[in-house]
A protein has these predicted regions:
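Cationic, histidine-enriched alpha-helical/coil surfaces that engage anionic ligands
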Residues: 1-347
Length: 347
């Protein structure tokens, strides 16, 4: 499907215009500044152990939305300014997300090891909301290979998490981040629209984002993904290349394009923004599962390449890697089932 090339001059009465985009970006920039203030206030741990993590998630969430708006509606903005701001937002969002990603990956792999061993799962390393106490069955110890694999993964990912934490602290105190915060503060009060963009229609830009998503989905092997247990995700499982699987790339790209499409729908159209499509939300959830499983499989494979590990440890890591690739396959199947579903109009 050929992408649409919107014309800023095209607009019709009653449709969302560049003025609505300016209000949307200003609101998202204000959310970014509010999250930044919250992150600074919770940095001393006064709000609990999970306070800084919640603030970092809020900061990343607002950064993603500002960045998505600058990308989708770039033609209505100062292009050089939009590109520079997007690059800086991507930097800060990626830097802040590394620590959480390492912790979540470790939790995922340890839970999978215990599940594959038929034992009681270990407690998560990521803080969870308090729940009522439950009676758990007695823990069964892991086998030697699984226990050593768990210890190896814990060492590697805990070290990576510590480095990511230090990197985030360094980034937040850097002149580069302060310059970005100043730029977002200006955006909260004055959105740099292109000349004549205040009255331009946003519809063609949002439609172009949807077209990019549709084209990327059409290139996916959805027919294969729609067959359970097709084992496509396990292809090249013994490749000596430690890099992520090339077959995962198009799925990751669809995940990003789906997020851009969902965020574009949040920009007010007329009186109010449309309600979130549950089909898009479910598809995004499936692609998040795909990303998490693919990255966990890479972590298991990299750990298995550690020099001088015992055969039992390497075997446990190999089983763990295959398990996560099966999770990749299951996520692709879930996405295919969700995407092929059509919303039935209400009667």
């Amino acid at each position: 499907m050929a992408p649409r090339h919107p014309d800023p001059a095209d607009s019709e009465p009653g449709e969302a215009t560049g003025a609505a985009l300016a209000a949307h970006l200003s609101a998202r920039a204000t959310e970014f500044l509010r999250a930044l203030r919250l992150h600074r206030e919770t940095g001393n741990g006064a709000s609990g152990a999970d306070g800084p993590a919640k603030a970092a998630r809020a900061l990343r969430r607002s950064a993603r939305r500002v960045s998505a708006g600058l990308y989708t509606f770039r033609g209505l903005l100062d292009p050089d300014w939009a590109d520079e701001t997007r690059a800086e937002l991507a930097w800060v969002s990626g830097t802040l997300g590394l620590e959480h990603a390492c912790a979540a990956r470790l939790d995922r792999l340890l839970l999978a090891l215990h599940r594959l061993s038929g034992t009681t799962a270990a407690p998560p390393t990521v803080p969870a909301p308090a729940k009522a106490p439950t009676t758990a069955p007695p823990a069964v110890p892991l086998t030697i290979g699984a226990a050593r694999a768990a210890a190896l993964l814990d060492r590697r990912l805990t070290l990576a998490r510590a480095r990511a934490h230090s990197g985030a602290l360094e980034a937040l105190s850097s002149a580069r981040f302060h310059a970005l915060a100043d730029r977002i503060a200006v955006l909260a009060g004055d959105v740099p629209l292109a000349p004549g963009a205040a009255g331009a229609d946003l519809g063609p830009y949002a439609a172009a984002a949807e077209d990019r998503l549709s084209s990327a989905v059409a290139a996916l092997p959805l027919v294969t993904a729609g067959h359970p247990y097709n084992a496509q995700a396990l292809a090249d499982g013994l490749s000596p290349d430690p890099a992520p699987r090339p077959q995962d790339g198009p799925w990751h790209q669809v995940r990003l394009l789906l997020r851009l499409h969902r965020y574009a729908r949040e920009v007010p159209c007329g009186a109010a923004a449309p309600a979130e499509d549950p089909r898009l939300r479910a598809a995004g959830h499936a692609l998040n599962r795909h990303r998490d499983a693919a990255e966990a499989a890479v972590a298991a494979a990299q750990a298995a390449r550690t020099a001088r590990i015992a055969p039992a440890t390497a075997y446990a890591l190999g089983v763990l890697h295959a398990d996560q690739r099966h999770e990749v396959e299951a996520a692709r199947f879930a996405f295919q089932q969700t995407w092929q579903r059509r919303t039935v109009p209400a009667r």
